[in-house]
Amino acid sequence: MKKILFLALLTAMLFSCSDSDNEPVGLKAIEVKAAVDEVNLWGNLVLDISKDSLYKVGYDNGDIVTISGGSLTKPLDMAFTDKMMSVGTWGMCLTYFSNEATLTIGLANASFSDRVGGKEGDILTISLKEKGGFRDVYERMKLWKTANRSDYDSDEMFANFYPVECHGMKSGVVYRSSDPLLESNNPARYEYADRFARNAGINAIISIADTEEDWQSAVEAGSGFGEYCNERYSKGALLFHKFNVDIFVDEQAAKVGRMLRAMIENNPPYLICCSMGRDRTGLISIILQVLAGTTYEEIESGYMRSYYNWHRLQPSSESYNDFLTRILHRTLYIM
């Protein structure tokens, strides 16, 4: 029953670009079968087919597809997009990532398997619902970013390093950034973030993207890790609390609780970081701001600053309100 209610809410609120009662528009692609190879760390469904399998039979980014079969309780309409966040927080999509060979069915910033369904071994059918039906949104939700320091205004901007600030919170207590720990998780920026952690006098570094095993492997290899992070590790002040972005699933919520308790067992200043320092770090920053007694304006300013630091997205940008409503406002509504 909870999943049925969730699907109804998801369709009504989060995916207004598709109406499952309408007749399919502009069908040119053929149906494709795919098996769920695994449910990944994020709770999303990893398929056994590549994006080229769809391109070759008429599908393209910006199409709306229907996924059906397996253990899914009903056919689901969603965008086919290579930019997962273009569907907004808790939006459904058929997507792919540059470092992965096959397609994924997922929820942006949430766990598809927990929220919607699906399991390993499911045989699913992919069919075309509307050719180009998501294209306008897809184009508006594109984000610019590079790995070149020279493309950014400052080292701080490039590292996405800045304080978490609001009413009720002393300045200089909590900072956030992209990953300062490992080159493998933040290739171009980790040394910048590590240097700013040192300059800010950070005592406790809380990573919500790395495991201690990954950290130890890099240290044993002798390269690819933050020097200041290593100093904090030797003092017992480099804390590993990796969790996925759906912090409202019981298992993940428990991990967040353990992270917050570990945080207050150490002295400030604190640095909270995930890979980009944007999504998971943004959620934790909102929680801390709310606990301190923040305002909406402070939440928006702090959360959207990461989008400026990474993507030069600012209030005057044409697509700013799209990201504000589809990402931040949905996140706050869910919280």
Give the location of each predicted region.
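C-terminal motif of bacterial Sec signal peptides marking the signal peptidase cleavage site
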Residues: 13-16
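Long, compositionally biased stretches
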Residues: 23-109, 113-129
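Ser/Thr-glycine-rich phosphate-binding loops at phosphate-binding pockets of nucleotides
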Residues: 276, 280-281
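Positively charged n-region of N-terminal signal peptides that target proteins for export
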Residues: 1-4
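The Walker A (P-loop) glycine that initiates the GxxxxGKT/S ATP-binding motif of P-loop NTPases
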Residues: 272-274
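Sec-dependent N-terminal signal peptides
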Residues: 6-9
